[in-house]
Amino acid sequence: MPVIRNPAAEKSTKDERTASCTVRSRKRKADVAIFLQDPDDTLDCLEMTKKKQYQDRGQLSNEMTCKSPHKLIPTPEKEEHEPNPTSYPHFASLRFSPVSASPLPRLGWANQDDVWRNMLNKDRIYLRDKNFFEKHPQLQPNMRAILLDWLMEVCEVYKLHRETFYLAQDFFDRFMATQKNVIKSRLQLIGITSLFIAAKMEEIYPPKLHQFAFITDCACTEDEITSMELIIMKDLDWCLSPMTMVSWFNVFLQVAYIRELQHFLRPQFPQEVYIQIVQLLDLCVLDICCLDYPYGVLAASALYHFSCPELMEKVSGFKLTELQGCIKWLVPFAMAIKDGGKSKLKFFKGVDIEDVHNIQTHTGCLELMEKVHINRAVLEEQNRASPIPSGVLTPPQSDKKQKSDPAD
């Protein structure tokens, strides 16, 4: 007997099979997603889920027990623990208060106090150590200066931004502080890999991997750079967003020249002024002792040498007495910069004229370091010869004071 087909029943069965396959497919994809998920993210999600369930259960309990809506008092969220402030060897007296007044103007896109607090916290979290060369007996501090000077040259060749260079400098210094017994032949690999990471984070169109390997004259292969990239990021605990020296300086100079608050994110300062002051940062960063001071302090002290104390205090939030140590340390560098004359703005093909000041340039800072050492020796000799520090005025002796006119 022929079997009578029921189209309606077949359609229902087909829909059920399709739905079942869809469920299995979705479940399979979910399993893959769970497998690929970061274990730390999974733990965070579990903690968030437990917290949410606890809060929901508490809210439900309140709704059941409280008869009046006004008795439902929401529990304030717990504030995240702020990192403990880190003391610098020569800057231990400075402490930033979370409620200190922010020098930033009122912002339309964020609370200026929150932005300022976040900037200060980054200077606490990202730690540097100028004594990390003690862990590497085969290395000398001048090797760091040579490497950073070469990275500046690489940045100019590939038209990379200043922020990219200063990110690479921060990655290099913090990574070296986590290592021991690094040999000289590995130093260039660590430096170019730090720049490779920074370029991928900061540049819109970063150079390709083979370009970074090529610029080392094949001393570093592509495989070595990618392997070192993972090592650096792991040892830095994936903390790759510091507030660099040039970031602080950009903020201070922008506050000094701000005219229209709605355009706060657009540079409003003269490029020529920017170039003169940022050259001081390019020079002092070659000295390992710059790691004694927070980046914000270095930027404010550099601004002091090219402006007045009142302006520096207004735009940075620091007091002059708080920066005296860093200001004094920068004197030989500022003397070398001013003796060399004004820097000229460089123009690059394919770079917008409004952005040329942000391109890292190579201005021969390594040669200027020789003048810095000479200036430092001269200043130390003057301080030994005179018991009075330079720049300090003393009142005249009593017998040499001018006598006032009785008629007055």
UniProtKB/Swiss-Prot annotation:
Top-rank taxon, per record: Eukaryota
Source organism per UniProt: Xenopus laevis
SUPFAM superfamilies for this protein: Cyclin-like (SSF47954)
Protein name: G1/S-specific cyclin-E3
Family note: Belongs to the cyclin family. Cyclin E subfamily.
Source lineage: Eukaryota, Metazoa, Chordata, Craniata, Vertebrata
InterPro entries per record: Cyclin (IPR039361), Cyclin-like_dom (IPR013763), Cyclin-like_sf (IPR036915), Cyclin_C-dom (IPR004367), Cyclin_N (IPR006671), Cyclins_cyclin-box (IPR048258)
Bias type Basic and acidic residues, positions: 398-408
GO molecular function: cyclin-dependent protein serine/threonine kinase regulator activity
Annotated transmembrane regions: none
